[in-house]
């Protein structure tokens, strides 16, 4: 069921976005440790990560991001994908909402999903996320 929902979200976003007006971006990083929400994801070892994004003039976007991980349970890769909509109003207020899936190939029990809403103005911003399929406690 999850894969069907993911496919539907990507299909909707990709059909609504003209490839001629789309902006493609990529990124890569080498870090001394991958820390997420205050916890190491690589057992305090180096991480290599990278991703690809596509965004349309309409504000629709989707992308993917990956990194090595080390939890001691067989998971070696985190593969995230996301889709959303972002815009800035004439008064300078910006907003962003979307869906984010964290997946761990070979360790499906670690997979989880979030929806998020971000609001910003000038140099200030706030993002609220809510888990849709919460990850297990990794303390």
Predicted regions and their residues:
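Outer-membrane beta-barrel proteins
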Residues: 2-8, 18-139
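Repetitive helical segments and hydrophobic/amphipathic motifs
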Residues: 11-15
